[in-house]
């Protein structure tokens, strides 16, 4: 056979040594599948934040076959520890939590959908109000983007006003992207610079007015010069609120009969049991939750005061799959486990430890570093010209060591000390290499493929 021939007459094969292998010969199943996906799916996948170009172009495994705890297996069977974004923040309790999955399996066996409503939607509404006593009513959906859109529809219906003052990222819908109509730089600090709102009706122009986080004077000016009906913002993302900032926002809303909405899709249940606003003692008129609420299962919620929420009845907000049973069932069990294990305390402590150890590592190799974000959503930045190349190098080298890693860690309860120690053991050598590159070594010679794309930019 061929192998025997090669062993007995190696000279026959010498000519092949100079032949370059076909493009993709070294690609795994995931990389090849993504090439097919780009021909079939606009953008290649369903979520910008999961595109391989955001991590490691041409090298990222892209697809998973299994996920458990804080581990992920790709289509080639390779096992990785996820020290990255954990499903984009969906799994505080880790992937495939047994109690949550068992609860879901039970309702799948009993039936997920029927002509009747599922009782779990009532139980979940009661639970969310119990956790947030300021709220009176609840509407459920299945994604954060649609829950944010629902909250805006309800608030506009309640106030009879179109204009929204906003800060931060709130999804892909027309109401939000309309901020870029006429001036495509408006969202530069919130979304991707240069975002074009094609497909968004032009008559929405002027309905969205952005302000920077911790800049109360900007919000005051907007309210003074426009007939604002809604203030929409994240409680916190990358920096802490200045003393009096959230209280000032609340006062402006109250004094001007404006509905205040806190978007807790990302921040919820990470530093408190419930919305992050509980930490600061400032209650909104409405709050929006998603991501961690179902530990990987699709569920979102809009909670609010009765005076505002009853405006839902004056408009039309309705969807068939908001009545399925898996989402609220998963949420109820997730909340039960979170409360019992005090998950928010654990992931906050772990995140603070990771941030401190990044700082120590940077100091060891005399690298500048900026650490930001909620403790459980901690991230770092090395503010130098080659940062995107270094970020790519981190992902590339850590992937070889069996880690999904970049410059952000969305912490889960499965990130135990032994895993964190192993992560830093391997990250040490990458920081050393970055230090060498800052001293003159050529980082381009170390990269096996293209540089990763820049991520989101926001005004908070």
Give names to the regions the model predicted:
Residues 123-230:
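PLP-dependent aspartate aminotransferase-fold enzymes
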Residues 280-312, 323-330:
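Active-site PLP attachment segment
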Residues 9, 15-66:
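Active-site-adjacent loop/helix segments that line or gate small-molecule/cofactor pockets in enzymes
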Residues 334-359:
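Structural signature of PLP-dependent enzymes
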Residues 215-221, 233-259:
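Active-site core of PLP-dependent enzymes with the aminotransferase class I/II
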Residues 1-12, 339-341, 349, 400-460:
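PLP-dependent enzyme catalytic core of the Aspartate aminotransferase-like
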């Amino acid at each position: 056979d061929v192998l025997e021939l090669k062993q007995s007459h190696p000279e026959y094969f010498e000519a092949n040594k100079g032949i370059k292998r076909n493009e993709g010969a070294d690609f795994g199943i995931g990389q090849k599948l993504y090439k097919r996906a780009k021909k079939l799916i606009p953008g290649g996948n369903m979520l910008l934040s999961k595109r391989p170009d955001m991590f490691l172009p041409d090298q990222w495994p892209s697809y998973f076959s299994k996920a458990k705890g804080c581990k992920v297996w790709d289509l080639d069977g390779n096992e990785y520890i996820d020290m990255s974004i954990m499903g984009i923040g969906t799994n505080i309790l880790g992937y495939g939590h047994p109690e949550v999955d068992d609860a879901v399996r039970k309702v799948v066996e009993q039936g997920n959908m029927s002509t009747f409503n599922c009782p779990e939607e009532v139980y979940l509404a009661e639970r969310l109000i119990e956790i947030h006593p300021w709220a009176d009513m609840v509407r459920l959906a299945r994604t954060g983007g649609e829950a944010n859109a629902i909250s805006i529809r309800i608030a506009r219906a309640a106030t009879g006003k179109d204009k929204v003052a906003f800060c931060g990222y709130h999804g892909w819908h027309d109401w939000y992207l309309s901020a870029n109509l006429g001036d495509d730089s408006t969202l530069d600090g919130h979304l991707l610079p240069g975002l074009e709102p094609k497909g968004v009706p032009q008559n929405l122009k002027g309905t969205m007015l952005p302000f920077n986080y911790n800049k109360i004077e900007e919000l005051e000016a907007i309210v003074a010069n426009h007939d604002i009906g809604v203030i929409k913002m994240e409680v916190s993302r990358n920096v802490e609120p200045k003393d009096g900032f959230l209280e000032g926002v609340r006062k402006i809303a109250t004094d001007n009969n404006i509905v205040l909405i806190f978007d807790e899709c990302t921040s919820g249940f990470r530093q408190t049991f419930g919305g992050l606003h509980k930490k600061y003692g400032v209650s909104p008129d409405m709050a929006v939750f998603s991501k961690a609420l179902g530990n990987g299962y699709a569920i979102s919620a809009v909670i609010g005061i009765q005076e505002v929420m009853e405006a839902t009845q004056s408009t039309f907000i309705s969807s068939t799959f908001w009545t399925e049973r898996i989402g609220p069932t998963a949420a109820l069990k997730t909340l039960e486990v979170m409360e019992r294990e005090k998950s928010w305390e654990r992931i906050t402590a772990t995140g603070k430890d990771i941030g401190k150890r990044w700082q120590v590592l940077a100091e060891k190799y005399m690298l500048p570093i900026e650490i930001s974000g909620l403790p459980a959503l901690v991230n770092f930045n090395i503010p130098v010209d080659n940062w995107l190349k270094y970020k790519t190098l981190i992902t590339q080298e850590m992937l070889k060591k069996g880690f999904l890693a970049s410059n952000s860690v969305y912490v889960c309860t499965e990130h135990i000390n032994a895993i964190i120690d192993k992560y830093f053991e391997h990250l040490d050598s990458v920081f050393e290499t970055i230090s060498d590159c800052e001293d003159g070594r050529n980082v381009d010679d170390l990269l096996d493929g293209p540089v990763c794309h820049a991520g989101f930019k926001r005004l908070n």
